[in-house]
Amino acid sequence: MTFVPQINDADVETVARAMGSMPDSASVAEFVPGPGIQRLELKFDIRLLQEALEECLQREDFMGGMQDQGFAALPLTRRPGQSEWTANDLSGRYWLRADERYVEEPREDLVPEVDFSEFNPKFAGTYFEHVHQELAKRFPIGRTRVLSKGLYNCNSWHRDPEPRLHIPVISNPGSLFIVNHHVTHLPADGSVYFTDTRGYHTALNGGETRRVHIVAALAYDQVTE
């Protein structure tokens, strides 16, 4: 198609330059590091991770009151002796700008991450226990949860009190993680990803199957307000 614009200005030139090449559609199916998200050298066996997920779900169902909205959690750690989990235990403090005022506001209560120091005995002997042990040898691990996200679903655009480690267990090419201005796919291949969720971020599942990650909070500093 030959189109001759009636006006030749900077906008026409910008679009013409953009039309001169095709966007990269291959690398979006891979991990690309960026500010706020890095792949660590530590790696686990993806087959054993997926087997452990099925084994744990036979022992305990996903929890949470927002499962119909696509968010479900399975707590892998607990306070010593804990047997019941509140909605706040499964989610916890975050901040967001909710409306046209663009004012940042807190939601939910702060969770003392260091209190969640004990692996959930319901899942003792699973590969997830080994994962937790290996993480705890290297980092100050707080709450560790298995988080499930339904298809065609997205979290809020928010920030957390602390960074998190992500280990994808089940994923698809349409499952993406965004931290501030950087977006990338996290393949489910046993890799461990550092995500600086102290910055604004979200997880979205634009694929046709569920997305399941192990998410471990890094309890270096306890935010108190």
Model-derived features: positions:
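Fe(II)/2-oxoglutarate oxygenase catalytic core
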Residues: M1-W157
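A short hydrophobic beta-strand segment most commonly corresponding to one strand
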Residues: L165-P168, V192-F194, E208-E225
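Intrinsic-disorder/low-complexity, polar/charged segments enriched in Ser/Thr/Lys/Arg/Asp/Glu/Gln
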Residues: P35-R39, E162-R164, H213
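Residues in well-ordered beta-strands of folded domains
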Residues: R145-L147, P168, I178, L204, ...
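Residues that flank catalytic or metal-binding motifs in active/ligand-binding sites
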Residues: G142, P161-P163, R210
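Short, conserved beta-strand element in jelly-roll/cupin
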Residues: S148, R159-S175
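A short beta-strand-loop-beta hairpin characteristic of the jelly-roll/cupin
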Residues: P168-A188
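Short beta-strand His + acidic residue motifs that chelate non-heme Fe in jelly-roll/DSBH
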Residues: N155-W157, S175-F177, L186, T195-G207
